[in-house]
Amino acid sequence: MQFPAFYVTGTDTGIGKTVASTALLHAVRARGHTAVGMKPVASGCVATPQGWHNEDALALQAASQPQPDYATLNPYALPAALAPELAAADVGVSLSLVPLQLAFAQLRAQAEVVVVEGVGGWAAPLSAQLDQADLVRTLQLPVVLVVGVRLGCINHARLTAAAIAADGLRCIGWIANEIDPQMERIEDNIRMLGQRLAMPCWGRIPWRPNAQAEGLAQHIRLPE
């Protein structure tokens, strides 16, 4: 696999980063590699007998092979469904890069590929002191951009790609995720995205509200 680890970000919140990340995990596994997901910081967690768990992080865990320990996959599990900075403050947690570095190293030792899913859109901060760019830079990861295909997506995608580049980081690919079945001229929009984003398209995930991640993996085009 050309990229043994990468960071999945999005053009906004709720545009399908987890859908894309789980599809990526299954696509990597279909090539015969072991692959695990990571959700460094997750808010909106629910209480379980095993502790606070997040729906997206659980989806990443289910798509992983081998399946990592939840606390390693999601080191910061925050109860409130808020921006991480606010959710962490609510429970008196101070986010630090060190636990994330340690967890990532453990996951790298467990599998050939690690898919790290970010929070919200690229510019969403992790804390008052940390941006996602700080984490990505520390872990030395390239970035894959998930574009939620809806009205305004070309602007959002170009701004996000420019922000990633301005942070001195490398965006190695983008994925079109169709999230609005009523969108007009969707083919033209995806064509325009391809013309304006200076990185290869890693796939186009169609609108399938009840599809399983393993089935969506067929729509991912991993680089050789």
Curated annotation (Swiss-Prot):
Protein localization: Cytoplasm
Which residues does the annotation say bind Mg(2+)?
T18, D56, E117
Q: Which domain of life is it from?
A: Bacteria
Q: In which pathway does it act?
A: Cofactor biosynthesis; biotin biosynthesis; biotin from 7,8-diaminononanoate: step 1/2
- Which residues does the record give as substrate binding sites? S43
Which Pfam families does its entry note? AAA_26 (PF13500)
Query: In the UniProt entry, which residues are flagged as the active site?
Result: K39
Any one Gene Ontology cellular component term annotated for this protein:
cytosol
**Reaction equations catalysed:** (7R,8S)-7,8-diammoniononanoate + CO2 + ATP = (4R,5S)-dethiobiotin + ADP + phosphate + 3 H(+)
Spell out the SUPFAM superfamilies in the cross-references.
Answer: P-loop containing nucleoside triphosphate hydrolases
UniProt key word Nucleotide-binding: yes
- Please list the cofactors this protein needs: Mg(2+)
Annotated ATP binding sites = G14, I15, G16, K17, T18, V19, D56, E117, G118, V119, G120, N177, E178
Q: What is its main location?
A: cytoplasm
Indicate the quaternary assembly: Homodimer.
Can you tell me which family this protein belongs to?
A: Belongs to the dethiobiotin synthetase family.
This chain's function reads: Catalyzes a mechanistically unusual reaction, the ATP-dependent insertion of CO2 between the N7 and N8 nitrogen atoms of 7,8-diaminopelargonic acid (DAPA, also called 7,8-diammoniononanoate) to form a ureido ring.
Matching entries from NCBIfam families are given as: bioD
Protein name per UniProt: ATP-dependent dethiobiotin synthetase BioD
